[in-house]
């Protein structure tokens, strides 16, 4: 790749406006997703009746039906190639993503999942942004990404011999898929609502396979547990959370993925309070590194090469 690179301060990026609103949307998504790790870990770790397959069915069975009228109304106005890009969105934030992440949460704590999926997603988004959009992080963002990488590496290495390796691998696969989906959404110019509707509606394809598998525990679940999971999975985590994050991407561009690294902080606190998953010294240091990294990543600039 040839050309010159000029660093643009984050507050003056010329390709996006509405920074304050973008931060608000990003923080809304962060709050919802932090709780999702705790709520989902509670279910799939044996504390509840529902399993990973049930949670994914609730998540997209409900949100897909809610957003189906939206997609039908907006379909004629979608940009060319939107349906092709939608496949990337489904893989990176739809039913396959949610199923792999939920299965990983059976094997590793909520704090690990939150650190290794939304925590490392900015690293993958930065890499794919460089390849597909010609973006390069400035010095401050680069330092932030380095701190995120260091925190994640410390967490993985410290628990490599404790049976959590498969869970960690699942979390990192999800982070990579999410990162490329984010970049491709930006490149395609999809509006936040369109991207969310495409992801949730196309993920409805999971439901028939779920029903035919005979793996459902919905009828056996207590009404209270079913109601909590239906609202959190089907409305908050999918429709509201995805819409908020996609809106943040539209307003903040390359800086939006950085805010997701705040999720480990809130998820770790929530898991300690509600699930008795008290972090050890390594987890605390890793989360601190990730939190510092996201702050630098959000404040730093982006270089456009070309």
Enumerate the language-model features and the residues they cover.
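Hydrophobic transmembrane alpha-helices of multi-pass small-molecule transport proteins
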Residues: 6, 67, 128, 137-157, ...
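Membrane-interface helix-cap regions at the ends of transmembrane helices
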Residues: 35, 39-42, 46, 62-81, ...
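A helix-boundary/kink motif common to multi-pass secondary transporters
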Residues: 48-52, 109-110, 133-138, 191, ...
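Glycine-/small-residue-enriched transmembrane alpha-helix faces in small-molecule transporters
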Residues: 1-57, 150, 158-187, 206, ...
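Hydrophobic alpha-helical transmembrane segments of multi-pass integral membrane proteins
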Residues: 20-28, 52-70, 85-88, 144-147, ...
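Helix-helix packing/entry segments at the starts of transmembrane helices
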Residues: 58, 94, 98, 112-120, ...
């Amino acid at each position: 790749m040839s050309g010159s690179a000029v660093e643009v301060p984050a507050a003056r990026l010329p390709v996006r406006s509405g920074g304050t609103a973008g931060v608000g949307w990003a923080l809304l998504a962060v709050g919802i997703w932090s709780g999702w790790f705790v709520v989902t870990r509670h279910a799939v770790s044996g504390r509840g009746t529902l399993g990973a397959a049930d949670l994914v069915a609730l998540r997209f069975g409900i949100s897909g039906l809610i957003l189906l009228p939206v997609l039908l109304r907006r379909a004629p106005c979608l940009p060319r190639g939107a349906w092709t890009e939608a496949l990337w969105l489904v893989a990176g934030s739809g039913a396959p993503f949610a199923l792999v992440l939920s299965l990983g949460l059976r094997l590793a704590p909520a704090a690990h999942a939150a650190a290794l999926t939304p925590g490392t997603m900015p690293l993958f988004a930065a890499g794919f942004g460089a390849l597909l959009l010609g973006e390069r992080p400035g010095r401050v963002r680069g330092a932030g990404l380095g701190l995120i990488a260091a925190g994640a590496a410390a967490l993985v290495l410290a628990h490599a011999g404790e049976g959590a390796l498969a869970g960690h691998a699942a979390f990192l696969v999800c982070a990579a898929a999410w990162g490329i989906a984010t970049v491709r959404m930006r490149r395609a110019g999809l509006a936040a609502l369109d991207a969310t509707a495409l992801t949730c509606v196309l993920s409805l394809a999971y439901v028939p396979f779920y029903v035919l598998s005979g793996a459902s525990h919905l009828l056996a679940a207590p009404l209270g547990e079913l109601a909590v999971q239906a609202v959190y999975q089907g409305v908050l985590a999918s429709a509201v959370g995805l819409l908020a994050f996609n809106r943040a991407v539209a307003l903040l561009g390359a800086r939006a993925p950085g805010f997701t690294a705040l999720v480990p902080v809130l998820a770790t606190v929530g898991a300690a309070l509600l699930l008795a998953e008290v972090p050890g010294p390594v987890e605390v240091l890793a989360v601190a590194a990730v939190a510092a990294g996201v702050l630098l990543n959000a404040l730093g600039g982006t270089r456009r090469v070309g």
